[in-house]
Amino acid sequence: MEGGIIHGGADESAFKECFSLTWKNPYVLRLAFSAGIGGLLFGYDTGVISGALLYIRDDFKSVDRNTWLQEMIVSMAVAGAIVGAAIGGWANDKLGRRSAILMADFLFLLGAIIMAAAPNPSLLVVGRVFVGLGVGMASMTAPLYISEASPAKIRGALVSTNGFLITGGQFLSYLINLAFTDVTGTWRWMLGIAGIPALLQFVLMFTLPESPRWLYRKGREEEAKAILRRIYSAEDVEQEIRALKDSVETEILEEGSSEKINMIKLCKAKTVRRGLIAGVGLQVFQQFVGINTVMYYSPTIVQLAGFASNRTALLLSLVTAGLNAFGSIISIYFIDRIGRKKLLIISLFGVIISLGILTGVFYEAATHAPAISSLETQRFNNISCPDYKSAMNTNAWDCMTCLKASSPSCGYCSSPIGKEHPGACWISDDSVKDLCHNENRLWYTRGCPSNFGWFALLGLGLYIIFFSPGMGTVPWIVNSEIYPLRFRGICGGIAATANWISNLIVAQSFLSLTEAIGTSWTFLIFGVISVIALLFVMVCVPETKGMPMEEIEKMLERRSMEFKFWKKKSKLVEKQNQSA
């Protein structure tokens, strides 16, 4: 349980108040921004691998048409993040929030160096694991540190800056990817530059204090009070200190120890259990609605939609990353105005519609793929696709059939008179690719020419615009404020670990799913999961807008998990506002 100050009506002007308070007290903004670089690291790693993977496939032929190995390179960072998030929960409670961030920075920097120097895919995977460890720790620590070092009335807006820096990191990674497309060592630069923000945060965090609430919980009361006096105004700080003192003393009295966390009691505690249902559920659904298929594989999805070149795929993916960053800015404005719950519901409605569009577009693209021209294919008989030459009925072959050939892998060379006309199915290697390009034709290995490509980009854009302000940022905000102080580190670690496990499942299965059942059916699955997520939010997630953290705990204590579990204002808030 944690103390806080009641601020009636803060939700109506939170965005302006955030600017006003941070302008008057830039120290608060400095705390939020420095810790938020952890979000930048998170976002950069999510985005950079999507572009780097295009060039890793070109450099390592063992990776090029090996779907499992591509998924491994992407998902090993996620596997590392699972362990990192679990370790982060322990490190946050035992060593402190700041120490956990410093550990994350060191691991991320080490991983970036290993990846940049990797001579083979195996060492690249090792580097991805180290980066994942750092990202996992940072993902749950940064919003927690910001939340505990923020005045209650602008807590949502400041924690949203972490979400903005996540999406900003993704946008930056696409810019970096695009900048290094023509530079020797392309993907090595893309992955190695990731160490710079980690080093920057490491330096900045050495100049900042530990979380005041963690310090108070560990008995370092004078240090905590000194920090709170720098964060809160003179008229609010004494009340905040008293509330925090009362909450910590109550916890110690109830639990009998300020150090040892009893996991059985944690699971039995009504407030913790209900908080975990909401917090873990949001983190799981954040991944299962498919966001990181878009962020990890965005250029690949663009190529599946019919855009052939790596550079074009990266350039168009930059648009989705920009929309993602824009959506997080929207979240900062609305999070303390309309609330967490409404933002989630609006977000999921839009996600469902967008996934419906993507399902339809990719279905139409697959069923209208250009046919294979026997004349074009056999023009160079020595490079004709072997599976095509041995097929009983070549009239049934189209571009999609060609790309599924595997003995050996084959590619599609578009018609010289137009990409929608029948083209050639040839063996996929660099010399054949060059031959196709020398005839001013397009070479496809991951998707087919399509007149529906721009509609796919529209669907991706709408998906990002709706996802980012709600499901993109709100789960991290809710998890930073919904747990009692005593269990906040461990519960945050549990929720973040659930997020990364879900992330791993999605990242390791997306390309395999698209190969097995097609891109359209894969997006349909995400759409169905999004409907389930919407129902979950409506029933299980409380509204915590503008509420001090001790009041959130009391709300969880007295309400049952039913459809009307939340209200605009709790009774305690109304009573305290009336008596103020």
Curated annotation (Swiss-Prot):
Native organism is: Arabidopsis thaliana (Mouse-ear cress)
What's this protein's name?
Probable inositol transporter 2
State what changing residue 413 to A does.
Answer: Strongly decreased nickel inhibition
Family of the protein in this entry: Belongs to the major facilitator superfamily. Sugar transporter (TC 2.A.1.1) family.
Impact reported for residue 399 to A: Strongly decreased nickel inhibition
Q: What keywords sit in the KW lines?
A: Cell membrane, Membrane, Symport, Transmembrane, Transmembrane helix, Transport
Known regulation of its activity is: Inhibited by nickel and to a lesser extent by cobalt.
**What GO terms are given for molecular function?**
myo-inositol:proton symporter activity
Per its UniProt record, what InterPro entries does this chain match? MFS_dom, MFS_sugar_transport-like, MFS_trans_sf, Myo-inositol_Transporter, Sugar/inositol_transpt, Sugar_transporter_CS
UniProt-annotated location(s): Cell membrane
Annotated GO CC locations: plasma membrane; pollen tube
Q: Which GO terms describe its biological process?
A: myo-inositol transport; signaling
Task: Give the intrachain disulfide bonds.
Answer: none
Task: Tell me yes or no: is Disulfide bond among this UniProt entry's keywords.
Answer: no
User: When this gene is knocked out, what is seen?
Assistant: No visible phenotype.
Q: What does the entry note on its domains?
A: The PSI domain (383-450) is not involved in the plasma membrane targeting and is dispensable for the transport function, but is required for the inhibition by nickel.
Activity across pH: Optimum pH is 5.5-7.0.
Tissue-level expression: Expressed in the tapetum, but not in pollen grains. Detected in leaf vascular tissue and in roots.
Matching SUPFAM superfamilies: MFS general substrate transporter (SSF103473)
Locate the transmembrane regions by residue number. 36-56, 71-91, 106-126, 129-149, 156-176, 189-209, 275-295, 315-335, 343-363, 452-472, 490-510, 521-541
What does the UniProt function comment say about this protein?
Answer: Plasma membrane inositol-proton symporter. Specific for several inositol epimers, such as myoinositol and scylloinositol. D-chiroinositol, mucoinositol, alloinositol and pinitol are also transported with a lower activity. Not active with galactinol and phytate.
Q: Does the keyword Transport apply?
A: yes
